[in-house]
Amino acid sequence: MDQVGRFVADAVLGIDTLWGGDVMCPSGTGRFIADSWFSDEPLPAAYTTPAAARVRETGGVGGKTVDREAIEAYLREVDIPAAMQGLCGEAEKIGGLRGQYLAGLRFCLQTMWELAMEILGKGKPVPYDRCVQASTGKLPEPSQPEAKRDRVAELLNRAGYSAAKSDGLLGAVDGWRRERVVPMASVKALGAAVIAYFDNLSAAHLLPVLPKELSRVPRANIDFLPIKDAWFSGSMNYLGRARNADGSPQYEASYEINASLQISFPEFQQLVSHEVVPGHVTTFAYLQDLYVRGVAGFEATVLTMNTRAATLFEGLANNAILIAHGVTEIEQLPDEDMQIGVLLALLQDDAKNQSSYLTWGEGKPQAEVAATLRRDFLVSEERADKLSGAWGRHPLLGRMYLPAYRCGTERVAQLRREFHAERVLPAIYGCFGLVDISTVDEVLRAAKA
């Protein structure tokens, strides 16, 4: 590992540990900020130092009860600010596209550090604007759900679920969902079928525009795992550490889905395209291959939530169902039930942004936020409660991650309308160098020049 790799490893895994994450845990129940570690490099001191295990065990600064003694011991052993400063210096020396990416990563990590210090009472409150700008490159703004909501009402009416009845549009949505609910007892079989469907579509509409070297990379080597009593609705865990006899990666991942989740089949289709193929699993597998072939740097192997790269990846994943079908607009999808499912999923991600905006930007109470999400964004009662509560009021996720979905989705959709697939898809999958929601423009502008 070179010097920049050491700084990236210590900074990312230092922040991850400080917030209670464990990148080596195969389950989303233990992971948090760092999404992957598949380089075959030794883990850094930020992970292996004796004090780190206790911080992870107690949940770090995000734990129900903050173990200050454990955190202080860890911070005496690991100098996270020095790693971030070193990363900043390396970014300046490297320059170009990679240098800009590393500088953006450092800005996000610095903001996460400041949020941790805020919780510990060692720093000033971090402005909400700074948090959102760090992870998305933009200032916070409210969601605009009206057009999607109107289109849902139109499609539901055509399907026989009229919003004109006494229980209104919410009642129509709930009725539509009830008649299409996925039986969780059969989720593995259904998941395999839907994965195969989108993998075949991706072979037809994505693979031809990517470098031929990626054709041998499995896009969806994943196990679907129902999990009980999880705090999340679903968690994609990219592992990438299994090797074939010749030492090549197997590009393996798992997807844990909450066994209590109620989801319609069209929404499940969108979920699979988002989390698996051609969404997150495909993206991570391609980046692993690019790293193995020396096209991408070490930073591509330790991907990180609450960053501008994560915003781009969420945007890619939310557009994945369109990418798979080779279209740019929801109304071009072949089935109106599928269109409803996509619109409802995107409204849920608009609701994530709105929860963040109302909670941290306007200081609204949870009950008011939950009611707004249910009424204006058509989310289920369970989703409204989670997005306004556990997620929305989380000191890190609520301020840095919830705005990422909407921002990334709208930007990727715009880029796909503006540029031909032969240019934009290789760019957002990292084939011209690892990019984020801000630096992807530089790659595409260079192509236009």
Could you tell me what each predicted segment is?
Residues 1-449:
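N-terminal maturation segment of proteins
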